[in-house]
Amino acid sequence: MPSHADPSPHPAELVSMLESMMLIRAHEERLASLASPTAPGTCTAVGQEAAAVGVVRALEPRDRILTNHRSAGHLIARGADCGRLIAEVMGRVDGYCKGRSGTLHISVAELGVVLTSTIVGGELSLAPGVALAQKMGQGEAGAITAVFFGDGAACEGIFHEAINLAVTWRLPLLFVCENNQWQAYVARRETMPADPAATAALGGGRIAAWAAGHGLPTAVIDGNDVDAVHAAARAAAASIRADGGPRFLELVTYRQRGHFEPDDQAYVDPAELARWKPLDPIARAAQRLLDEKVIASGELSHLRERARATVAAALKFAENSPWPDASELANDVYA
């Protein structure tokens, strides 16, 4: 992939990305702690915050996003309000979709988030259409589409269909595979061949190799390194804007919690989980900023407390939001 990345982010931007990751973590851990049925079926992406923040922060307001059932990180990185997100999960009227979507079907038009899809690979079926509309003149000139999906979706036929269309029609589409090593309750190693030797040590690369087979420029990135993700995403977005063609990023990360909440992860090898824990993206980013003296330990504690306070206020907002009126049950239902 040619390098069109802007210079390294300003220290203030690095701190901002760390704070965004902390807010995402605090938000999802609070949701996970809520007793069912208060937040039923919540799917978290704890451990994958660098992938969300690194890519979304590389996009522009004119761009469009399609994502999946682990969507909170992408939404919060894009600027979504935690209170409205929690209200949506709780089925309250102040949620972004008036309490109808939960975390699995949410759409936030004002942020350019077209949809989240609970259907594995569902976002891949629609992303080429959004990018085609942009190419045909809909929306602002130079805008691109980013679609987030997991390694499970890469095992669906729509993965190849979407890439084939994007390459053939030269669509302004950024494919972002968050390879978190798990497909619901099944380990990735049980569903696809071994990774290429060049990227095996990183823990990924097979999915990017599939994409490259279609003639798509690809990159395999340490998805727990927010700086590396951000740089790769900026380069990919700049390349798309420059030549109009698609790009592909495989972000190698790890799902630290279960498939959904509650899930005791009894199927996960404790030794494997222990190997990934030291690679936690928030801890790594924080330590780097401390080592480089960009931030002091006291400031780091302040960021954590501010994230927790924001989520506490968000939960209170959601709890105080009214329930929808029964008379509106069929509103906004078109099929």
Tell me the role of every PLM-derived stretch.
Residues 32-34, 62-67, 176-179, 209-216, ...:
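Short acidic (Asp/Glu) and glycine-rich catalytic loops that position anionic groups and cofactors
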Residues 162, 168-173, 178-242:
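Ligand/cofactor pocket segment of small-molecule handling proteins
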Residues 1-40, 61, 284-295, 317:
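Cofactor-/ligand-binding subdomain signature composed of acidic, glycine-rich
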Residues 2-3, 239-335:
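Glycine/aspartate-rich loop-and-adjacent alpha/beta segment that forms the canonical ThDP
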Residues 7-8, 17, 41-45, 76, ...:
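Hydrophobic alpha-helical scaffolding
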Residues 43, 66, 174-176, 220, ...:
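Structured core elements
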Residues 135-141, 199-235, 278-304:
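Conserved thiamine diphosphate
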Residues 26-33, 37-169, 190-193, 199-203, ...:
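Cofactor-binding active-site loop characterized by glycine-rich and histidine/acidic residues
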